[in-house]
């Protein structure tokens, strides 16, 4: 019995964030999305500043690849599709927030953190596109980070 209870519990801080956001979204609907996005964007700024302080100055490609790198070592491993000075594309086969099938809107709200982290590191604007997403029911996430021209 104990084993079944544990399997229903979040196993990481990211899973806890996902459960909290899904619950908040379920209760408050679309009104919750700007709040979720704002909180995750602000947290992304904090994390980006910490990474920049630790790692120093770097270009967009290096910052994006450095940020993505842990996902390349977790099972199932993410893949880099392309990495240039203005565009980094990846495929991920597992959602750290457990958003599978919960919709693109909540995914995009939570992923505001990721583009903010990279943007803060390089002091530039980043756009994240998600043409495929586990949250939308796709078999993988296809994330595209794009450095915007100023």
Where in this protein do the model-derived segments appear?
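N-terminal accessory segment detector
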Residues: 1-89, 93-110, 124-141, 146-150
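A short, contiguous, amphipathic alpha-helix enriched in charged residues
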Residues: 110-120
């Amino acid at each position: 019995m104990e084993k079944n209870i544990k399997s229903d519990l979040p196993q990481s801080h990211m899973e806890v964030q996902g459960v909290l956001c899904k619950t908040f979204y379920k209760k408050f609907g679309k009104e919750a999305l700007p709040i979720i996005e704002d909180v995750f964007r602000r947290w992304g700024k904090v994390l980006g500043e910490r990474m920049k302080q630790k790692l120093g100055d770097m270009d967009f490609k290096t910052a994006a690849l450095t940020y993505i790198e842990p996902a390349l070592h977790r099972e199932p491993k993410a893949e880099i599709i392309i990495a240039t000075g203005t565009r980094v594309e990846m495929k991920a086969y597992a959602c750290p927030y457990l958003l599978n099938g919960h919709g693109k809107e909540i995914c995009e709200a939570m992923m505001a953190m990721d583009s903010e982290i990279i943007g803060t590191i390089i002091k530039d604007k980043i756009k994240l596109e998600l043409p495929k997403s586990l949250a939308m029911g796709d078999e993988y996430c296809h994330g595209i980070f794009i450095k915007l021209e100023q």
